């Protein structure tokens, strides 16, 4: 599964869903005391198992050793990982059409409802509003949207930024992003005029 982290990051780069130093991925395995996460400031198209950062978990807290440089979005990953008892991957990418759709004012949750096949397999949360990258506000709002109303969503859009998805492994999280990116591409190619239901109050409410 650690090898798959590099595999999905390289595939995301090939699809132009990230530039060389964008995106991040983490894995926490059931019954273990380590969080595996991509490092900060490295080219994500050349991520391999030996470059993955390993962080010890002690009494529910991350123990960062001196010199370790995990992704700047570590807090967002940990919010989504720490309360989950099983094996989970968190994947954050910047897919072009998904970001473009949000920039155009679409709520990805509402758009997904227009495509039954996506809505069947992938639960899409309401968009997160525009917030600074690597901020606690982004981490908290992303987590809040992913569990809003007691529902565990699979993916959430982050306005003018990217998307964050979860899965039992990196490829499952990747597939959620792929489905949403596909419908965003279709909608934009068709110049689809979806009723704009997104507003700042809704995006901040969780």
Predicted regions and their residues:
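Glycine-rich flexible loops
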Residues: 1-206
């Amino acid at each position: 599964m650690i090898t798959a982290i590099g595999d999905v990051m390289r595939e995301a780069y090939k699809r132009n869903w990230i530039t060389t130093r964008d995106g991040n991925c983490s894995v926490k395995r059931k019954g273990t005391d380590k969080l595996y996460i991509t490092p900060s400031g490295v080219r994500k198209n050349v991520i391999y198992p030996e470059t993955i950062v390993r962080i010890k978990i002690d009494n529910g807290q991350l123990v960062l050793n001196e010199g370790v440089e995990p992704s700047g979005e570590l807090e967002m990953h940990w919010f989504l990982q720490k309360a989950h008892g099983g094996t989970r991957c968190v994947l954050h990418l910047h897919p072009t059409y998904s970001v473009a759709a949000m920039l155009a004012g679409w709520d990805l949750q509402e758009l997904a409802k227009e495509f039954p096949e996506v809505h069947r397999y992938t639960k899409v949360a309401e968009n997160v509003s525009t917030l600074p990258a690597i901020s606690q506000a982004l981490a908290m709002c992303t987590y809040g949207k992913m569990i809003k109303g007691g529902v565990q969503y699979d993916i959430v859009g982050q306005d003018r930024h990217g998307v964050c998805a979860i899965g039992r492994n990196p490829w499952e999280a990747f597939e959620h992003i792929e489905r949403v990116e596909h419908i965003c591409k279709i909608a934009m190619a068709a110049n689809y005029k979806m009723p704009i239901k997104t507003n700042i109050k809704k995006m901040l409410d969780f």
